[in-house]
């Protein structure tokens, strides 16, 4: 070994000795692996979430001002959104608190003490009153004031890892807020279109009741003229009573939906005044771009992903705790035994201290903390994998339901067209004077019944499509 390499080796020897003297790290747990869709999760949060909040407002595609207003009110006033927002602020404050530990600290302190010295103690000579010797005991009023500074050197990255873990939690909370936002918007939209479905059904039932009343009036006139018996109109009366009962049921459902919407929008002061609008048309098939790659837009997967990232940083921090801690301290103070001397230049004192803490034996505390961090990380990964599987199942189930209901709506549309042809034939025969007007009403009632069935199927498809939108994280576009 030449002289040029000998001295650097000697200089590094104390560092190697310190590292060798640290508490041993035990590898007792195997890290779990994440599901494949983890690679599809966008890691640009929370910026990406803010973009989703601005551009993926899927409810705007309905072009319904009432629905947009309800969802906006819910997002602004719902208690769930307020809770999610406070969780983000708490996580941000905790991250800032950890980040501040990585920088230098400077404090100012001052104290004054009045004390009587013991003549029999270690400071016994100061208990004497001998001005020639510099003692004026036994009473003294001493004072100290000045600056103290400290800096913990994060050589091994422990504090940086803790900050990264906290920032991961912040991003996870932001993703949870977006998930709450999507769930809230989906709940409001589903209730709103359920109300519109019931409102449309109410209109059809009123038309059925009108046709039934026409038949009842005709039967009564025929009975009064002695043309028919009273038995022939009984079935029509029963059907009319059933229709009125259905109307009452629909009105009750609409009131319940309005109450639930008021609760979601936190609107307890005034009743909702919704106006009926036409239901959106049923799409015959799912769009071509529908795929599991859209799962990356799900906010719950984003949140689970960031909890995993946070747990991995926590492991890094737990590992860094096995290495030595180095602290720098300095002070600049005025210290005097008598207050009258406190502000003299001779009362000034200063110093610099470098401290080293070497974890040699800790009874397994550091390894226990590392095991806890690894177990929590494995739990986060397992939760993420479970969320991925559930997300895939949610999409498959919702997509299948949407496709099935779309096919049912197509079949129902054909049934309604056939029923309308029967009504058209009856109307033509009435115009020709072959049948009475009540027979046209009798032909219209089955067609209206089929129309009511079609509205219910249309509402079910609409509800399923909103669920599919939620399963894809709000990124599915009809």
Curated annotation (Swiss-Prot):
Belongs to the outer membrane factor (OMF) (TC 1.B.17) family. The gene is mdtQ. The lineage of its organism: Bacteria, Pseudomonadati, Pseudomonadota, Gammaproteobacteria, Enterobacterales. The keyword Membrane applies. It is a lipid-anchor. PANTHER family: MULTIDRUG RESISTANCE OUTER MEMBRANE PROTEIN MDTP-RELATED, OUTER MEMBRANE CATION EFFLUX PROTEIN. Pfam families: OEP. A lipid is attached at residue 22 (S-diacylglycerol cysteine). This is Putative multidrug resistance outer membrane protein MdtQ. It is found in: Cell outer membrane. A lipid is attached at residue 22 (N-palmitoyl cysteine). The keyword Acetylation does not apply. Residues 1-21 form the signal peptide. Coiled coil: none annotated.
